[in-house]
Amino acid sequence: MDSLDRSCQDWCDRKQHWLEIGPPDLVERKGSLTLRSHHKKYSKPVLVYSWHRDREAFPKGYDIEGPEKVKKLCNSTYRRLGTDESPIWTSETHEKLSQMCLNTEWVEMKSKALLNEETVSSGIIERVTGLPATGFGAVFPRHPPDWSKMCALTTYSEDYVPPYDYQPHAYPCQDDYSIVHRKCRSQFTDLNGSKRFGINTWHDESGIYANSDVKQKLYPLTSGPIVPI
């Protein structure tokens, strides 16, 4: 009876092993790259056959294959509740996918100066090299003092020079935004306009315009009530 049970168990093991490795012509040999081994235990870094099944069965936050003699499956992620650790565990994939909501193109970049007090030293620029300071052969080329004079020279200033020096007369700046000389819409002749001011827009004959007060101050009444135009 024992031999029958043992033979049945061997047949089941061989059947299961045959279903896992595939056809009989792909029999696993020791030293092969498939690593479909049932009699030897590999470490976690070695990705053997059906390694993902074991990883999915592991509880989070607890090493099921640790050196402890007595295994405690309750030591999983739930032991972190109520502690001072990070409240939410975020996977690396979730963190990378959440970056699509961040617009990094409009992030303000801090400008860094090329020259500052630490990188610039007066001894480097003003050192004695034995070469002329300006002109041909100078280490640091510099423009002559009258370099910008060529931008100010014109034909008129060169050919039509004033005969003597004189001080130009400074005219006072007048108020160019005055409404004294502005022509307003007439209440008596411009009757075709629809945008008129007043209570009765079509028969406003008060004679008061927007610049009437300014005209009275500029042209005071001297001889008659007629205001000059």
From Swiss-Prot:
The lineage's top-level taxon is Eukaryota
Q: Which residues form a coiled coil?
A: none
Which GO cellular component terms, listed alphabetically, does the Swiss-Prot or TrEMBL entry include? Answer: axonemal A tubule inner sheath; axonemal microtubule; cytoplasm; plasma membrane; sperm flagellum
Which Pfam families does this entry report, sorted A to Z?
A: CFAP95
Sites carrying sugar chains: N75
Subcellular localization, per the record? Cytoplasm, Cytoskeleton, Cilium axoneme; Cytoplasm, Cytoskeleton, Flagellum axoneme; Cell membrane; Cytoplasm
Q: In which tissues is it expressed?
A: Expressed in undifferentiated embryonic stem cells. Expressed in airway epithelial cells.
Gene Ontology BP, a term: flagellated sperm motility
Q: Would I find Cytoplasm among this entry's keywords?
A: yes
Q: How does it sit in the bilayer?
A: Single-pass membrane protein
Give the transmembrane ranges. 124-140
- Write out the ranges of the annotated region (Mn): 153-163
Q: Which residues lie on this side of the membrane: Cytoplasmic?
A: 141-229
Q: What is its main location?
A: cytoplasm
Q: Which UniProt keywords apply?
A: Cell membrane, Cell projection, Cilium, Cytoplasm, Cytoskeleton, Flagellum, Glycoprotein, Membrane, Transmembrane, Transmembrane helix
- Recount the UniProt induction comment for this entry: Down-regulated following embryonic stem cells differentiation.
Acetylation as UniProt keyword: no
What role is this protein assigned? Microtubule inner protein (MIP) part of the dynein-decorated doublet microtubules (DMTs) in cilia axoneme, which is required for motile cilia beating.
Q: How does it assemble?
A: Microtubule inner protein component of sperm flagellar doublet microtubules. Interacts with MYH9. Interacts with MYH10.
Q: What is this protein called?
A: Cilia- and flagella-associated protein 95
According to its UniProt entry, this protein's organism is Homo sapiens (Human)
